[in-house]
């Protein structure tokens, strides 16, 4: 059994999703969004760190999975996204959680079956896979998708290696 915290980082809205993986079964534990209110980036980064720390304290995950930075058309946006990811990752590392990263296309492939899926498709499939009564918010659905991707990737690694791979574990320690 493993509790997985998935993060969809953003400098204004950071989605989170928590699931429990027990064999092939995935159970929804919680999800939502950390919405930053500060005008300046350093204040928003502090809010992201505090929010992720609070979620870790509440759910006590075993694993932290986060979406990788993609190349944005706007370099400033990509830098801010990278800094938001950093705030979330530091919260995970401070809690001694192993950190795993997944590309957006891989996450969409794991959840929807195609790397080019849109947010609505991800929301629909996350709702279906976790048997949720309603579609989660877009950023929360993306974060749940990160957690589902990790669960599916971990199952594949276990099947291939006979045990969980630690190749990416502790990357930020």
Swiss-Prot record:
Gene Ontology MF terms: crossover junction DNA endonuclease activity; DNA binding; magnesium ion binding
One Gene Ontology biological process: DNA repair
Binding site for Mg(2+) 1: 8, 139
Primary site of residence: cytoplasm
Cofactor note text: Binds 2 Mg(2+) ion per subunit.
Localization of this protein: Cytoplasm
Gene3D superfamilies attached to this UniProt entry: Ribonuclease H-like superfamily/Ribonuclease H
Cofactor: Mg(2+)
Keywords: Cytoplasm, DNA damage, DNA recombination, DNA repair, DNA-binding, Endonuclease, Hydrolase, Magnesium, Metal-binding, Nuclease
Active-site positions on this chain: 8, 67, 139
Cellular component GO terms, alphabetical: cytoplasm; Holliday junction resolvase complex
Domain of life: Bacteria
Enzyme Commission number(s) of this protein: 3.1.21.10
Pfam families: RuvC
Substrates-to-products reaction catalysed: Endonucleolytic cleavage at a junction such as a reciprocal single-stranded crossover between two homologous DNA duplexes (Holliday junction)
Binding site for Mg(2+) 2: 67
Coiled coil start-end: none
SUPFAM superfamilies: Ribonuclease H-like
Similarity field: Belongs to the RuvC family.
PANTHER family in UniProt: CROSSOVER JUNCTION ENDODEOXYRIBONUCLEASE RUVC
Binding partners and assembly: Homodimer which binds Holliday junction (HJ) DNA. The HJ becomes 2-fold symmetrical on binding to RuvC with unstacked arms; it has a different conformation from HJ DNA in complex with RuvA. In the full resolvosome a probable DNA-RuvA(4)-RuvB(12)-RuvC(2) complex forms which resolves the HJ.
Function: The RuvA-RuvB-RuvC complex processes Holliday junction (HJ) DNA during genetic recombination and DNA repair. Endonuclease that resolves HJ intermediates. Cleaves cruciform DNA by making single-stranded nicks across the HJ at symmetrical positions within the homologous arms, yielding a 5'-phosphate and a 3'-hydroxyl group; requires a central core of homology in the junction. The consensus cleavage sequence is 5'-(A/T)TT(C/G)-3'. Cleavage occurs on the 3'-side of the TT dinucleotide at the point of strand exchange.
Name of the protein this chain belongs to: Crossover junction endodeoxyribonuclease RuvC
Gene coding for it: ruvC
């Amino acid at each position: 059994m493993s509790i997985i915290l998935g993060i969809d980082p953003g400098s204004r809205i950071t989605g989170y999703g928590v699931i429990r993986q027990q064999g092939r079964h995935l159970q929804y534990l919680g999800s939502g969004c950390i919405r930053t209110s500060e005008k300046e980036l350093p204040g928003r980064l502090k809010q992201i760190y505090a929010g992720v720390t609070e979620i870790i304290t509440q759910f006590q995950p075993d694993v932290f999975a986060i979406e990788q930075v993609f190349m944005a058309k706007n370099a400033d946006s990509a830098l801010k996204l990278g800094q938001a990811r950093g705030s979330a990752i530091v919260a995970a590392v401070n809690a001694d959680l192993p950190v795993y990263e997944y590309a957006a296309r891989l996450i969409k492939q794991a959840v929807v079956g195609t790397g080019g899926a849109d947010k609505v498709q991800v929301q629909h499939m996350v709702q279906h896979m976790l048997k949720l009564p309603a579609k989660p918010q877009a950023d929360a659905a993306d974060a749940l998708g990160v957690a589902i991707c990790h669960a599916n990737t971990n199952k594949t690694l276990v099947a291939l290696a006979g045990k969980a791979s630690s190749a990416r574990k502790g990357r930020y320690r």
